[in-house]
């Protein structure tokens, strides 16, 4: 039986993934070392030695706040207004995959508290434990309400009597995919606008309300795969109503961070091992490029103008309609993120993103700089586990005193749903040496003045209490809020006051929005646009006022505010914005694209009345490239065949044809082939990749060009793509040749699968039943990789039939399990004891 397992190349797969990446690109390793070199490996992992494996940035100290056995396997944390740390644990983490034991009582939500201010937790209370709680990934503490995210549910737990034990729980959302999966529902965050923000990974797929009804988005359309794909980020009211999908096509955004202006930031994980982890500034309603926007194909799929490197290719960054990445950080397993708006940490960390990444064992700051309509960022490490790579920061939060609280999953590996250790977990506190005591002063929410002071705290739970109190006070809050709003101080504090003012229940928000529109700070002018849109105000006068704003980021917000705006002035406003594009700023271009969504025909026509000739400069060519309307296609065709520009620089225009669905493009593309008197194969190839099957089949000239191009690219990925695209069944013999000759390459696998889809099983059997054993074994190798039922059936038939030579049968047996479906087939064969004796 052991030989059967060896022959079949599969039985029970135990996959343990270890992240051991340095993530050195763009990092400033401004850290001091707490040396752990002298410790033995076992000693290194003891709780009392936890700090010795960590490097901390200059000007900061790190202290153990809590360690096992007070907690284990923390996945997410929040810090409440009293400075207590709330922890979601995940002992019952993916047992079906990793085979680890489980606790039938379920996982826990634990409250850790430092009662004497020495910076160490003295008590650990279990807020909730239940068998339905299994590896939750998010927690958000809002007074007596605690929001916990665990696919398929998002629950609201309530502590009605204040005894730190949950009295009841309610479903906030449900139906979210990703149960017992890292790519499901993630944590909620309280925004300065009083809204809740959250996200889920690409297993989430849809969102349902507490009654099981699919939630509708801002357009009144269902949130699900018909409109959106992959990971998504959302905003809603605290009760779960008025849900907006603010972005889609991420892979696994872990936690969204919202600054006081209402800007959104989050990380996103690549397909593990491709060094494509990224940080995103989230422009509302944007597409973020994990899958092909049109086809849903993966990043590996060949396409015109494909990116040069895998990390760039990973996000389809050369495609029109993909919002750029703020930063790519290499390999990683990114987790929690925040915007640090406190003053306790050194200046370089203030008003910056702070992020935990469990893969490279690091908590980092991303130092932001404006760059056109977008941003750039550089990395400064805060806390790093260079000497102990079990350090797996799962989350980072800001305490009410401005210190950082870091959750450490603490495990030999991360990723692949594995857990090598189930009993350890740590919480660290990071603060300057002068703030070693953890003293949390009680806030006064009983008066407007006290609540306004609390509103300026860096901790989100404090700010939630303050915002809620101010809304309850109603118009009594106005004098104190106006002091902060009109005080000319920190613009982020002014923004918080502004949000609180415009959200007061009986206020005329337009008064403050009009003031904000005229503010000298562009950040405040941007907040005015966001607030007016959120409050469903008449945007037209505001947008007309700001359409010529000197700050490009304000104009970016004007463009985004035009998204699905049906006002009669919208097209002219957009045209004015488009005329101000500089031909270099991709952020601005994509904001224009978001603004024109579903209205490209109208908006582009308006643009043409303004600019007359869009091909006169790089800016106009960009607009044509980004446009999705038949009105732009003739200009696109001119750009594609402009021989004054090298072909490599025209690839983007050929790719842009894919994003224009109208019929006009087919005629123009066919004309390119007809006008190609020199029969430039490269040009015809690009045209054929932009055309559709029907147009090519109805055109003799295109058919001839297709045959010529196919011959020129034989044996390449482009050959496979064209034969598949146009279903060229006459290539069956050539596909069979490639299936045999390219057995160790992806081309061989694809050729075999394509041949089978063409009904070529007879040709395959003619080789397998032939006398050329080398060809037989080569074809079996390609068949084994295909993974379809038909291909597995063929290989299994060879392996189990005594009609074939034993060496051929053994070779076939080895090939059955070369695909995921093949592995399942092998297990079924073994389970049903169908293995012939001569193979054992």
Kindly give the residue locations of the regions a language model identified.
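Alpha-helical interaction segments
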Residues: 7-9, 55-56, 117, 577, ...
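Hydrophobic alpha-helical membrane context
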Residues: 18-21, 96, 420, 537, ...
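Long, ordered, helix-rich scaffold segments
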Residues: 407, 423, 430-840
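Beta-propeller domains with acidic blade repeats across secreted/periplasmic ectodomains
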Residues: 25-450, 469-472
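N-terminal functional modules and adjacent low-complexity/disordered segments of proteins
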Residues: 8-14, 46, 55, 649, ...
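Bacterial Sec-dependent N-terminal signal peptides
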Residues: 1-32
